[in-house]
């Protein structure tokens, strides 16, 4: 009888990527940090929810800092040194995520705000009255 070998998950290959792009999407409810190489292939990612925060605490600056540290640690293991930072969204975790990337040991060469702005597109939802 022929025996088949069991696959126990996918083994990620360690590649040496010195330069990369960090995409920080910061909303009011969550912060998502994706680190890619220059061609756009994702090397590591993390979010406030994936870092263990739930509910309203996902939108805090501390949750964004924790998510950025986790993603940066994984990128440093792949050999990344220099990064460009693209920030999108109005959330409170923007600055703290950038600061956490710097403290983790990544050299930031560029910070760009790529928040999409409508040129008077769709009608906005009505204002909340609390």
UniProtKB/Swiss-Prot annotation:
Keyword vocabulary terms for this entry: Ribonucleoprotein, Ribosomal protein, RNA-binding, rRNA-binding
Molecular function per GO: rRNA binding; structural constituent of ribosome
Annotated Pfam families: Ribosomal_S11 (PF00411)
Any one of the GO BP annotations: translation
Gene Ontology cellular component annotations, sorted alphabetically: ribonucleoprotein complex; ribosome
Record flagged with keyword Protein biosynthesis: no
InterPro entries the UniProt entry points to: Ribosomal_uS11, Ribosomal_uS11_bac-type, Ribosomal_uS11_CS, Ribosomal_uS11_sf
Superkingdom: Bacteria
Oligomer status and interactors: Part of the 30S ribosomal subunit. Interacts with proteins S7 and S18. Binds to IF-3.
Protein family (similarity comment): Belongs to the universal ribosomal protein uS11 family.
Functional note: Located on the platform of the 30S subunit, it bridges several disparate RNA helices of the 16S rRNA. Forms part of the Shine-Dalgarno cleft in the 70S ribosome.
NCBIfam families linked: PRK05309.1, uS11_bact
Identification of the protein by name: Small ribosomal subunit protein uS11
Annotated source species: Prochlorococcus marinus (strain NATL1A)
Native organism taxonomy: Bacteria, Bacillati, Cyanobacteriota, Cyanophyceae, Synechococcales
Gene giving rise to this polypeptide: rpsK
